[in-house]
Amino acid sequence: DILIADDLEQAIRESDIIITVTLAEEPFVKAAWIKRGALIVQMATLEVEYGVVTNADKIVVDFWDTIKHRMASTIAVMASEGLVKDEDISASLGEILSGKKTGRDNDDQVIYFNSVGAGILDLAVTTRCYREALKRNVGTWVPYWV
């Protein structure tokens, strides 16, 4: 179920899945609020405090080198400060999806996942959408380069 909450702390404490997609410049997700078995998905900037990352049983990323290069998330800043090292990364999403590594091993594990995406993925998705729109003869042409 998805519910609108008035109290951020209560919402996080009671959530199995926490997804952050904001432009926050300060952390608002506290490590003390994360319950056992939770999945934290950070897709943007500095929403989570360092303890959310360090307290996680597993750290999963989509593209670790890209995350470190972009310096746009908590874990990237931590890596630049030497607080997270390459060997601290449990798995990449690709390794889990291909079966090379496991995701959750038990219901109590706290998993932190950082996703920055990749240009090639954006290109693949938009190409698929474009082709589908052509096939269905829907959409609106927008003069982009005028």
Language-model segment annotations:
Residues I2-L83:
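Rossmann-like adenosine-cofactor binding region
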Residues V53-V146:
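Adenosine-phosphate binding glycine-rich loop
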